[in-house]
A protein has these predicted regions:
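Iron-associated oxidoreductase/ferritin-like identity signal
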Residues: 1-160
Length: 160
């Protein structure tokens, strides 16, 4: 059984993952409305991935006898600036999510819930990848400048 403290932390993370999904979906539609279909496609897949994280966490908690409590999701920002600004925001957001996941692992260690610690370690590893990917895109956007946006849009549009 998962402790009440861990249940609260995991429920908060499920909400955060759903919010992240909404954030990336909002970014996707904004980018597509600006004619950046490839960047929008990349963000739409990112949104689906975040929803998958939330579902995986909820399924895990249910399997362990915990109670999933879906919470209200705050409104996400809209009306973004440049493509670079959007991806900088995405990178910053991924760094924040990493800290939230680390907190759950720390609580699991304190509670001696090694199954939950083990389950969330995969998200720790995934966040390293997420941060590196977002940071890499930001770097490429900075190097490419406005003249390279079409090429990068096409490249990111190939994400599967």
């Amino acid at each position: 059984m998962i402790t009440d403290r861990l249940q609260k932390a995991i429920n908060d993370q499920i909400t955060a993952e759903m919010w992240s999904s909404q954030l990336y979906l909002q970014m996707s539609y904004f980018l597509k409305s600006q004619g950046w279909d490839g960047f929008g496609h990349w963000m739409a897949l990112q949104a689906a991935e975040e929803r998958g994280h939330a579902t995986s966490m909820a399924d895990y908690m249910t399997e362990r006898g915990g109670v999933v409590k879906l919470q209200m999701i705050d409104v996400v920002p809209e009306g973004w600036g440049s493509v670079l600004e959007i991806f900088e925001h995405a990178y910053s957001h991924e760094c924040k999510v990493s800290k939230m996941i680390d907190r759950i692992v720390s609580i699991a260690q304190e509670e001696k819930d090694y199954a939950t610690e083990n389950f969330f370690r995969r998200f720790v590893d995934e966040q390293v990848e997420e941060e590196a990917t977002a940071s890499g895109i930001v770097d490429r956007l900075k190097k490419a400048g406005d003249s390279g946006l079409l090429f990068l849009d096409s490249q990111l549009g190939q994400r599967k």
